[in-house]
Amino acid sequence: LMNSDDVLGAVWSPDDGRVSPSDLCAALTKGAKSRGARIFEQTGVTGIRTKNGRICGVETINGVIKTEKIALCTGLWSRKAAAMAGVKVPVWPCEHFYLLTKPLPGMDANLPTLSDHDRHLYIRDDSGGLLVGCFEPMGKPIDPDCLGEDFAFQLLPEDWDHFEPIMRNAMHRLPILEDAPIKMLLNGPESFTPDGNFL
């Protein structure tokens, strides 16, 4: 499948894996509840209380939760949420694009994920077709305040002009994409650091 004519080096990681984010979240929730944790969904955070430089509580739309520790898992609102505790977190939300093809003949359901860091793309199998995604170096920033506080699990408008250079790179690496029927282009917000690395 892969055009490797211009590849000078590669890494094969047969022990790597892929996790379904929704399944992982459900498993973590189940495990936490079995150990006594209480989960409050759809509960907006309005502030983080501190005392002597340490967390002592979280203010929510339903009242205050006393706690000495928090896990900042607020995605595109991470910068704003951390600021409630006086902490600067170097993340900013950007549009994140990926394309799905319709099923392709002979497509293996367990293909390894192809990451081409020089071309800022990743490709993997998805429901009999392919998923082509990108982590471009100059992402399109989003002001999270423009999305609204109830924004969750929604998509942003398509932008084929922005995705076109990534698609060209993907077709170079995987020529089968040139004739692959496109199912859809998706655009959802993700948080990124200025250098693209993890925190």
Residue spans of the language-model regions?
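A short alpha-helix-loop-beta-strand transition element characteristic
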Residues: L1, K88-V91, D179
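Central helical "cap/lid" subdomain
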Residues: V64-T113
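Flavin (FAD/FMN) cofactor-binding and adjacent substrate-gating region
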Residues: L1-E41, G47-R54, E59, S127
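General beta-strand structural signal in soluble alpha/beta enzymes
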Residues: I39-E41, T60, L72, I182-K183
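Active-site lid/adjacent beta-loop-alpha segment flanking the redox-cofactor pocket in flavoenzymes
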Residues: P103-L199
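Well-ordered beta-strand positions
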Residues: R49, E59, K66, P90, ...
